[in-house]
Amino acid sequence: MKSKLFISLSAVLIGLAFFGSMYNGEMKEASRNVTLAPTHEFLV
């Protein structure tokens, strides 16, 4: 019983770490695109 709980918990942690790294990568891409965008687009 304990081993099954431990395995499921570790699987959830691995999934969270994987999706967290993917999310961070997407956020970095988005912020990079925003900084590269011309400023007049935001001023209009």
Swiss-Prot record:
It is found in: Secreted; Cytoplasm. Contains a predicted signal peptide cleavage site in the N-terminal region, however the propeptide is probably only subject to processing events at the ends of the mature peptide. Induction: Transcription occurs independently of the rapE promoter and is controlled by the Spo0A-AbrB pair of transcriptional regulators. Keywords: Cytoplasm, Secreted, Sporulation. Residues 1-30, 36-44 form a propeptide. Signaling molecule involved in the regulation of sporulation. Secreted during production, but the mature peptide acts intracellularly, indicating that it needs to be imported into the cell to function. Inhibitor of the RapE phosphatase activity. Does not inhibit the phosphatase activity of RapA and RapB. Probably plays a dispensable role in the overall context of sporulation initiation. It comes from Bacillus subtilis (strain 168). This is Phosphatase RapE inhibitor. Disruption phenotype: Inactivation of the gene leads to a reduction in sporulation efficiency. GO terms for cellular component: cytoplasm; extracellular region. GO terms for biological process: sporulation resulting in formation of a cellular spore. Its main location: secreted. Belongs to the Phr family.
